[in-house]
């Protein structure tokens, strides 16, 4: 049976939550039952008996694995998939992306964010970090679809309308205390001046908000920052107080050894965005140097205008292959490490004690159909998930103890796609 979002609220997450019992799933090669109560895994053992009112899922023949966390993206850019491909980053931004975005309304952001969430859920993602416009509309989409999100208050020094909306979000911060939260998202050092960055530091500390920013994505960004401030972007952000525990630094491509040390010492997270970096020819994430210094790493897709899809399967594969090819080392970036970036390390970077299917952890998980041809044979499920899997293998998605996809069906998906097409027709005439 497929439940609506309002039904989920009645079934899961309330005081008398009857919970979910997953029967017959394979975990670490063993057939087990998994009980979920009030958003957490509460019991894992063979042959558990259903409790009164419990929602029972038949998972025979399926594997249960942790769900994915997408630590960098611009969700409503799903409306620009294929709109502007095969061009240099700053031409892409100045001549295509920013003019398109200038026409977007809150309803477009809502429609585009729902389309993005639909794609993410159908490929196993239960949390996304967003950095885009109209935060209330993006948050509304995430709340309605039952997915975790941290909605970034996108900040630029020269955009008074966006900054006014951000102030309104801060005034209503109590609306963002559940699984949909807000973060501060200054765009980059080339769009946010010193005064605004210092305000971001002060305000984020006052409200206890995470920071999410692009960092050292291109050689031009680094050269311009050195020319203006005498420091690399990383060093400049460190000087201003942006680098701190769990600040999300998206891209981190052009880093000196000193930059990497600063990131490691601060506890910030380097968010690896391999497919976008490759497509925009921005450069290669310095995987070996970052890992050698113990920097925390998570993975992200970026937006659909630069990476075109939102599947973490592709991101995992891209991260592994890129590191191996660039370093000419088949042993670097093993499947288990890459999988951890997308699950456990991603969860921690998102502020969620999840990423494992273990008692006491947040109940964010996937039921994987291991009969899909790309997963046969199954010598190593983790290797298959990183190197050969596709979104079609994800049968069921559970986020915060709620079923948000079952049998590859998501509530209202036809209407979500239709509304996104309406926005595209108005914005691009296509």
Label every model-predicted segment.
Residues 81-147, 167-176, 421-429:
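Alpha-helical scaffold segments that flank or form the walls of functional sites
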Residues 138-253:
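Metal-coordinating catalytic core of metallo-dependent amide/deamination hydrolases
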Residues 79-111, 118, 145-156, 219-244, ...:
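Active-site gating loops and adjacent loop-to-helix segments of metal-dependent hydrolytic enzymes
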